[in-house]
């Protein structure tokens, strides 16, 4: 039985439309549209593509994008000064620093410099702490996008065993907290986990987020499990693949995300969601989406 597809592109388009309708409804009362500032340092080609995609998504949603492109040799102090300027700019509701940064820069102090109420990526320690405590806050975009995909397809994690392969602060750790919040029994697996395939075979939900092309084969997956592939890897032949062997896994899973077109579009959708949420909070308007 072929797996059903967790279609991130279609759901992201639906979410963009919902956000656009909300923006159009409240912008006249606020006197402006929401604003998202994207800081890019250097000329990484992949980052440039991601930034263009975000700017295009902003346009489709009615969000004003403020592109801030700095030279690759910019200092931490120069970037912090820009972040502080954006923190004080009332036109800006969300700020993100496009990663990765040039090797001479440390992302952590720059992410700490962002106003937590404008933390569009949901990576500030205050927002991660709110997640840990089960409080409202701006949530990490990729994990939140995964949870949206599950919810939109009536996949309830409650009572299920979930294995998250990967322990990064970007995906693995916050996603484990979100699944736990949804009443799943969660295991975080990683490179030091003994018998990793066997651990995965116990799971009703498997999330792969390690950045290793097609690491997870069909023999790692329990028949009927839900598989979410967060990885995106470019092979030498130019193909984009995830961390899961899609063709093999899709023959035995109940649901699976494609790569591309699964989690990636939802990451951008949640970035827009966080920006509009911040806009509503800062302007005293109800958030409906």
From Swiss-Prot:
HAMAP family: THF_DHG_CYH. Its EC number is 1.5.1.5, 3.5.4.9. Pathway: One-carbon metabolism; tetrahydrofolate interconversion. One of its GO terms (cellular component) is cytosol. InterPro entries: Aminoacid_DH-like_N_sf (IPR046346), NAD(P)-bd_dom_sf (IPR036291), THF_DH/CycHdrlase (IPR000672), THF_DH/CycHdrlase_cat_dom (IPR020630), THF_DH/CycHdrlase_CS (IPR020867), THF_DH/CycHdrlase_NAD-bd_dom (IPR020631). This is Bifunctional protein FolD. GO terms for biological process: L-histidine biosynthetic process; methionine biosynthetic process; purine nucleotide biosynthetic process; tetrahydrofolate interconversion. One of its GO terms (molecular function) is methylenetetrahydrofolate dehydrogenase (NADP+) activity. Belongs to the tetrahydrofolate dehydrogenase/cyclohydrolase family. It catalyses: (6R)-5,10-methylene-5,6,7,8-tetrahydrofolate + NADP(+) = (6R)-5,10-methenyltetrahydrofolate + NADPH; (6R)-5,10-methenyltetrahydrofolate + H2O = (6R)-10-formyltetrahydrofolate + H(+). The keyword Ligase does not apply. NADP(+) binds at residues 166-168, 191, 232. Homodimer. Pfam families: THF_DHG_CYH (PF00763), THF_DHG_CYH_C (PF02882). Keywords: Amino-acid biosynthesis, Histidine biosynthesis, Hydrolase, Methionine biosynthesis, Multifunctional enzyme, NADP, One-carbon metabolism, Oxidoreductase, Purine biosynthesis. It comes from Synechococcus elongatus (strain ATCC 33912 / PCC 7942 / FACHB-805). Catalyzes the oxidation of 5,10-methylenetetrahydrofolate to 5,10-methenyltetrahydrofolate and then the hydrolysis of 5,10-methenyltetrahydrofolate to 10-formyltetrahydrofolate. SUPFAM superfamilies: Aminoacid dehydrogenase-like, N-terminal domain, NAD(P)-binding Rossmann-fold domains.
């Amino acid at each position: 039985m072929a797996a059903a597809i967790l279609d991130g592109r279609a759901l992201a388009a639906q979410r963009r439309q919902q956000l656009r309708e909300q923006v159009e409804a409240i912008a006249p009362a606020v006197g402006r549209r929401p604003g998202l500032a994207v800081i890019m340092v250097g000329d990484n080609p992949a980052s440039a593509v991601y930034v263009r995609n975000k700017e295009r998504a902003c346009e489709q949603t009615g969000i004003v994008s403020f592109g801030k492109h700095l030279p690759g040799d910019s200092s931490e102090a120069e970037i912090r000064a820009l972040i502080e300027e954006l923190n004080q700019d009332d036109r800006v509701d969300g700020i993100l620093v496009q990663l990765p940064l040039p090797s001479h820069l440390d992302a952590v102090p720059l992410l700490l410099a962002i106003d937590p109420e404008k933390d569009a990526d949901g990576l500030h320690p205050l927002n991660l702490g709110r997640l840990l405590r089960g409080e409202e806050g701006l949530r990490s975009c990729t994990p939140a996008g995964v949870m949206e995909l599950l919810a939109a397809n009536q996949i309830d994690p409650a009572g299920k065993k979930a294995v998250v392969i990967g322990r990064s602060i970007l995906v693995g750790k916050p996603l484990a907290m979100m699944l736990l919040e949804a009443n799943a029994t969660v295991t975080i697996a990683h490179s030091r986990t003994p018998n990793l395939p066997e651990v995965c075979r116990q799971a009703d939900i498997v999330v792969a987020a390690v950045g290793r092309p097609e690491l997870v084969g069909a023999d790692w997956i329990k028949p009927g499990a839900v598989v979410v592939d967060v990885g995106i890897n470019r092979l030498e032949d130019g193909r984009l693949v995830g961390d899961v062997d899609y063709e093999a896994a899709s023959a035995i899973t109940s649901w699976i995300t494609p790569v591309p077109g699964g989690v990636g579009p939802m990451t951008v959708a949640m970035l827009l969601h966080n920006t509009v949420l911040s806009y509503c909070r800062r302007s005293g308007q109800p958030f409906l989406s």
